Amino acid sequence: MTGQNKVWLAGNVLMRGLLQDDFELVKAARDTIVSEITTGMQEGIKSDWSFHQHGPQQQFGNYGLAFLTEMSSYSGLFAGTVFALNKEQQGILNSFLLNGYRWIVWKGYMDVNALDRQLFHSGQIHKAFSLAFATNALMRGSSAEDIRQMNEFLKDNYAPKRKGSAFIGHKHFWDSDQTVHRSSTWMASVKMASDRVIGTELVNEDNLKGFYMGDGALYTYCRGDEYLNIFPFWDWRKIPGITAYESEAPVPAFFNYGAHVRNKAAFVGGVTDGETGMTAMVLDRDGLQAHKSWIFTRDYVLCLGAGIRSDSILAVTTSVDQRVKRGDLLRYADGNWLPVQGKYVSSPKEQRFFHDNTGYILLQPSACVAISEKRSGRWCDFMGSYAPKTVEGEIVGLYIDHGREDNADYQYLVLPASTAEKTAAFAVQDIRVIRNDTSIQAVAVGNCFYVTAYESQVVNLQKDLQVDLQTPGIYMFRLHNGNWLIEAADPTHKQHSLSLKMNRKDVKIVFPPAMNREKAFLPDRTFISCLLWED
């Protein structure tokens, strides 16, 4: 028994010791509880400050949340006694909150990608709210700097709310195949899976329809409630961001689908400079293959897909978004915004859409389907603990219909915290997609280049810059004061170094040893090495 399950059992023993006035039993239970306050183990707190339980899978909203709330309670309970946590243990819990959970809560709502299998009614609110109590409990016994950051977390997420967020940046959770991007006005996250990391689970009839939730699900938030309680009305084959089969058949069930549950690919990861970043995955699951990547900037998320193919006769789609309807879904045609009612198939000339606070722009001609409609559903259909009661709601959705095309691709932008006017005027020519195929996905944005090399490739990033990427990986190149700043990541977690040439000059990036990574509590650039190279 490990992780939170072990803590729950030890907590029962602790209560027994208290009732029996047995000091030694209480001490033994306490020691068992705090023994789980560590990182780098197979389950529990990971070295990137995510949390695993039931094998290698992210459990922020379930076991990890229970672990943090319970441990914070013990931290406050034991403070000032002989059972008090030591400095290292307190520091681990504080970092778990500040370097882990702080990233996945936006204005009092937990990210859908963090809920795991527990898709309860208003779960985003309740789970985020429990963190407020955990934060207050951790303050007792914490350093002044940690208390300051905890207070900032509370101000960002709980009443009275700020207009924007003071906590911004970009982080890839390398142990859990998940990326979070935060600006002052919006947040986005991507959840993936690999041959290392399980995407999601079905336990106790929780998450009966969540088969695709780890296939590159992308959520964007401005208020935080954009997806609140949408689950009964979802088309579960069109979870935002995923590429999946178009079918009226029931979504595959985890417990009888064998090897199809796991993504077979190792190439899943992300790179960041702390402010922007690129995330990529090879999807190889259920007979469907795709190369998917996301570029996160201060103003938008650029989504790329290539090599989409399957061994099925079913059509394939890529979901751009599917969220709660708040106002009209608008399409841009001949200089005017027109409302979408029901289902609308756009023409190649109509590639801009807007809804609520978010714009969407397709960067290449695609068969895009826009939906704005009322739907009915039942919570019990995906969470077995609910009564069989029908509820109604309204959703809007956008998806790209690839049909049965072999080697399909896509390019589209998501513009959070935008307006219809800004979406219409957005200058797409400022983004240069250099290549988008199964070998490489490369994009130029200003003086920065984002590159995912799935295999060794030579690419001309600009007229006077040729890069020979000898080791597959995810790279960022940025010109800074006449030098090239390089950020790089190994998505396979198998390389000790990355080799490349810039204009025929050799560059080698060496990663720190994995053992040192976990023991040193290094920040979230652990899989990333940076280097200045003179132009």
What do the PLM-derived regions correspond to, one by one?
Residues 407, 512-535:
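Solvent-exposed, conformationally flexible loop/turn segments
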Residues 1-111:
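Aromatic-lined, polymer-binding surfaces characteristic
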